[in-house]
């Protein structure tokens, strides 16, 4: 019932601060707003290793439960605020994550590293991760059989209808408010579960 009520709600429309409409969304090749970053580590270093998961970018020891031992020569440095994704997938779905957790971090050599220019990074990450149209198109662009690969070149060549930068900023601010509310609800649920366990101790 609640789901049907949500589906009947009017589509959100974002406007300028003066109430005017933003320009129509324009088809844009991602390569026009993606700036690749290529810097690698070799030998001893003090960078922490991050893993790009569907739940977000995570410290490797948090993701696997322990610190992994392996050769990190050739790993890609990912500066704070830059984006990455695991280019291999078992089901054709890819997660694009922004580094918001570490100033000195590296990711696998198979993870392209880049940033968005003349675009809002928060909006773009949410758009690539959440839009059904994007997911469908990226799954088509990926190649392979049991495990498919979305190359960085294929990603940059993909074209999508995108709003102007000002509208992206508005949408991103709204999404960040929603994310904050979601995190607050998760904290509340965790506290209630802890309280519930205490009742029956």
Please report, for each region that a protein language model flagged, where it lies by residue.
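Conserved small/polar residues in nucleotide/adenosyl-binding loops
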Residues: 1-5
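Sequence-specific dsDNA recognition surfaces
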Residues: 31-83
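A short beta-sheet element
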Residues: 74-132, 139
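Extracellular/lumenal glycan-associated surfaces
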Residues: 169-181
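Amphipathic alpha-helical coiled-coil segments
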Residues: 178, 182-185, 189-192
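Short, solvent-exposed loop/turn positions at domain surfaces
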Residues: 16-19, 66-72, 144, 176
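Non-catalytic DNA-recognition/assembly elements of restriction-modification systems
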Residues: 13-41, 165
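A short glycine-rich beta-alpha junction/loop motif
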Residues: 105-110, 143-166
